[in-house]
């Protein structure tokens, strides 16, 4: 699953339902993952990550069906582990340190890698934290033929958001599903 394929699904879902859906920004993803907690994890220190996340030591080497582990406090499943998740943002090394922190969406140059969040079943449990972030592997976007499985990642997926504010102008509608602005 590439970021472009995930965005295309959001656009298709929007057309089918008449409601707008898109990939979350990094900030939206982290807010949903933390579920009003300030700690590294969305669960108490007395609980084991094993009951919340599929990771290197619990996954048996593959992703699993959603809801196989406990959800966070907002009943969102698999926010950590199982598959990492696409966001609409570009990867900035310092995250939001150099960018707007109110309703942020980080867009850099056209060839900037996108951000994935949440970690996957391949990761060590210590890497599965609410604030952990990674840049995508460029090979995931460079496939020529769909059968080239090594060009896709079996450990990256996506979840959708249905934002409260809908796109109004034509420019907003054009850029709604893409991590690129129409000028790029």
Please place each PLM-identified region on the residue numbering.
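Surface-exposed recognition segments
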Residues: 37-38, 62, 83-184
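Conserved beta-strand positions that form and line the central face of beta-propeller blades
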Residues: 22, 40, 51-54, 65-68, ...
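Short, surface-exposed glycine/acidic/tryptophan-bearing loops
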Residues: 45-50
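Short, surface-exposed recognition loops or helix-turn segments adjacent to catalytic cores
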Residues: 26-27, 42-44
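Short aromatic-cysteine micro-motif
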Residues: 1-37, 57-77
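Phosphate-coordinating loops and pocket residues in cytosolic domains that bind phosphorylated ligands
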Residues: 34, 43, 54
């Amino acid at each position: 699953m590439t970021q472009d394929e995930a965005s295309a699904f959001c656009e298709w879902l929007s057309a089918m339902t008449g409601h707008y859906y898109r990939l979350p920004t990094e900030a939206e993803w982290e807010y949903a993952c933390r579920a009003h907690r300030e700690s590294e994890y969305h669960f108490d220190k007395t609980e084991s990550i094993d009951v919340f996340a599929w990771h290197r030591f619990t996954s048996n080497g593959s992703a699993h069906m959603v809801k196989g582990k406990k959800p966070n406090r907002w009943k969102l499943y698999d926010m950590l582990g199982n598959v990492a998740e696409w966001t609409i943002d570009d990867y900035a090394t310092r995250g939001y340190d150099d960018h707007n922190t109110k309703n942020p969406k980080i867009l850099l140059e056209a060839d900037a890698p996108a951000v994935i969040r949440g970690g996957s079943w391949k990761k060590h449990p210590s890497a599965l934290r609410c604030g952990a972030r990674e840049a995508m592997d460029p090979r995931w976007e460079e496939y020529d033929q769909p059968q080239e499985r090594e060009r896709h990642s079996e450990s990256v997926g996506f979840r959708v958001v249905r934002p409260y504010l809908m796109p109004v102008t034509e420019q907003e509608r054009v850029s709604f599903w893409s991590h690129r602005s129409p000028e790029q």
